[in-house]
Amino acid sequence: MSPRKRDRSWPPADAVVPLAAPVTDNHTHLPVPADAGGPGSEAPLTAAELVECAAAVGVTRVVTSACEVTTWEESLTLARELPGVRVALAVHPNEAVLHAGVRETGPDGLEPRAQEHHGEPLDSVMVRLEETLRANADVVVAVGESGLDFFRTGEKGAAAQREAFRAHIALAKELDLPLQIHDRDAHTACVEVLEADGAPERTVLHCFSGGAELATACAEHGWYASIAGPLTYPANTALREAVAALPDDLLLVETDAPYLPPRRWRGRPNASYLLGDTVRFLAEQRGMGEESLCRRLQATTAAVYGTW
């Protein structure tokens, strides 16, 4: 008998019961033609379909992160065409490495996959990022995601990431925008850079993955922790303990779709319409009613990103 094939299809649109009150997915990646591939690409759903499914279950607003230069313009178009959509723009730390001309193999063992657009130097890309942010203030609500990813890069790449991270911090402060931070295997280094340069007033640790030490830093500095599907994974006891120690008013929720779905959908594409599983898990963990948590999350989202 052949091994059972894992189901990689999209979870059904009615997989999650509608939430008791509206919430915002403050970090997702809506599909655009320039970024084809990844989970769900075999039978893709359009951005419009994903937004419609999300709204039907109470996820009424989303912030889509466009962190490769090839996705900026198409993501801005989505925000102007689809209800409830806004954009965060940045150069992802792993993209920054390629724009800096670094081609070293990182700790993950994967060879870097440079494409034609990576020939544009990092300093030129950062100039273009600032221009794009300024020109699209009507639909841009954050700078992100930027930060450090030591899982995917070596020593030379880490230097390029730090340079880019510091440039994003300065840009977010200059434009008075929130900063969404990508932090993978780099908790201490991220905190050191933020403390050295001075973090933006609204700093969000996207897909929070830290332990007690990072939670303490967030609480001390007033940085926001954005909670995603990994909170629900059985092995992540330290993550749950860290999140439990954070105050309610520093919590946001996200999917980071199409990656990292909540536990019962692991191995399948993630989407904003599945966010309810994470919200309900978080409510149970904190001993809060679902509606109360939703309203608290929405108020915090408004404090960080404004309303739309």
How should each PLM-predicted stretch be described?
Residues 1-308:
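Mid-domain alpha/beta scaffold segments of enzyme catalytic cores
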